[in-house]
Amino acid sequence: MENLNALVDAALAEVEQAGDIRALDDVRVKYLGKKGEISALMKGLGKLSAEERPQAGAVINEGKQKVQDAIADRKSAMEEAALKQQLASETVDVTLPGRGELPGGLHPVNRMRRRIEDFFLRLGFDISEGPEVEDDFHNFEALNIPSHHPARAMHDTFYFGDGRLLRTHTSPVQVRVMEQGKPPFRIIAPGRVYRCDSDLTHTPMFHQVEGLLVDKGITFADLRGTVAEFLRYTFEVEDLPVRFRPSYFPFTEPSAEVDVGCVSCGGEGCRVCSHTGWIEIMGCGMVHPTVLEAGGVDAEEYSGFAFGMGIERIAMLRYGVNDLRLFFENDTRFLSQFG
């Protein structure tokens, strides 16, 4: 047992002298490992008598426990000291300004769509939606565009093999609303539409908003006032010049194209307005009686107006964008301007 006491004292001294955790582990292996000096004493217990063996084993285990506790305490102290040193060397200066986060923002097309919806919701209109994959009846026939009608040439349509198609405008939503309800109707139908066209001012997919109001006694004067007020709200120009030019659409009669005074040059004439001082903005007209009848509305009792516009077109003019394709390229340098 005297040898045990000497080994324990030597082990405790080396634990205190260990300069790092690796040296401390070397001490553990030297005295407590499988071939360690204190562990070797356990092998000598077999030479003792049965009466002496339990007492001797207890003494050896007590010595081993002292060394283990010393190693654990020393290791804990080393780790705490290392942590304090690390924290001291990595001190954060809380007075420095934060990095912050880059905030997101609405896409300019969504921003414009919400602005359009907000205006018409204030006027008591509802927002209606419909399928993007349409049938020929709702996209053409019900809108007074039969199969032989030359107006179909104005729509570069994507067809499926079963005769269905990708809608070329959101007007089919108006027909479906009339089919499913009873007048009066006050709705706008925003959504994606598809046409086989692609250049600086056209893409195969774009967004439209079409509006419909059907009630008793509706006249072109109601249409004119609604559209003019909407355009002044959209471009935030109180005295924005607005003019209506006679035009043709198979689903309205009479029909008109709506122009606004160029918001870039104030009507002086520039590249944006082709030096005319006016910019074509949307189409509109009084709903054709044939369309009302196709929707199950009595054209003798009710009348209404409809209008339609491309959201990207409005956004291009509102935000001064000269290439429609910029809206779809997802270039953050472009989109961040609208955040």
Swiss-Prot record:
InterPro entries: aa-tRNA-synth_II, aa-tRNA-synth_II/BPL/LPL, Phe-tRNA-synth_IIc_asu, Phe-tRNA_ligase_II_N, Phe_tRNA_ligase_alpha1_bac, Phenylalanyl-tRNA_Synthase, tRNA-bd_arm. SUPFAM superfamilies: Class II aaRS and biotin synthetases (SSF55681), tRNA-binding arm (SSF46589). One of its GO terms (molecular function) is phenylalanine-tRNA ligase activity. Its EC number is 6.1.1.20. The keyword ATP-binding applies. GO terms for cellular component: cytoplasm. Its cofactor is Mg(2+). It comes from the Bacteria. The keyword Protein biosynthesis applies. It is an enzyme of class 6 (ligase). Its main location: cytoplasm. Mg(2+) binds at E253. It catalyses: tRNA(Phe) + L-phenylalanine + ATP = L-phenylalanyl-tRNA(Phe) + AMP + diphosphate + H(+). It is found in: Cytoplasm. One of its GO terms (biological process) is phenylalanyl-tRNA aminoacylation. Keywords: Aminoacyl-tRNA synthetase, ATP-binding, Cytoplasm, Ligase, Magnesium, Metal-binding, Nucleotide-binding, Protein biosynthesis. Pfam families: Phe_tRNA-synt_N, tRNA-synt_2d. Binds 2 magnesium ions per tetramer. Belongs to the class-II aminoacyl-tRNA synthetase family. Phe-tRNA synthetase alpha subunit type 1 subfamily. Tetramer of two alpha and two beta subunits. This is Phenylalanine--tRNA ligase alpha subunit.
